[in-house]
Amino acid sequence: MTWPTANFGDRLNEIIWPHFAPEVCASSAPGRIVGIGSLLNHRLPKDGLKYVLGSGFGHGDEPAVDGNWRVLWVRGPETAKLLKRLTGQDHRFITDGAIMLGEMYPREEKKFDVSLIPHCSACTPGAWEALTEIANSLGINLISPEQAPADVVRQISQSRKVITEALHGAIVADTFGVPWKPLARSGILHFKWVDWTSSMSLPYNPSELAYRTTWFEHDPSVPAPKRFAWRVAGMISKPLLRRQLGRLASGSAWHLSDRALVARKIAEIKEELNRFKQEIAA
């Protein structure tokens, strides 16, 4: 399951689980897969079995965990700690299930020196045009997180380096061996990033971008004084944002997890998926 969204990270569930567990996805057995994304919260349906395959906490209120939960693994240690506090039981963490994309798609020939992946909240009229203008002026490939998941994966694989506000931009880049840098701004959750980076023994030290999407939007329902203030802020921030992204693109200190650890995590997930399929078939 996932929430109705255009964000490619959440939609990875649509391609990964049918590939690695087709018999489970086609099964009439009761229950739902709670997989990729920050899905463990109060919005989860209370009825029915829930099979947790690498999901994490990060949005909304804490979930009500009951006997209908079957946790195979969670995204990272922070989610595991939260579930232990809620249930009194230990739960295994491995990493985000998007790591399995490396087993599905080939490595692509490089086309882009640096790609930028904004958070899905930046895909709004005004903000997206501003980011496009800045990226084009710097020779940076701008990847929309609202493209089809396979298209996003392909462009990331075609990149030599990735700068990303989107968590799954970093996860996919890391999976394909593409060095990456994390970005932060208001509205981007710290918890889910730390949860995943900790699972891969990586630091989380994002660069804070000097913008808010509202500064570039032109919403007539917003009072005129606030619209004016936003417009001024956008005019001031645009050259600052351009310089900041230029420095990040040309700088050092890119992240990439240990390749042996990636292989080990994939093997652990395959082991859990085999156990899951046997349980469903029994």
Language model segments and positions:
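Active-site anion-handling motifs in enzyme catalytic cores
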Residues: 1-282
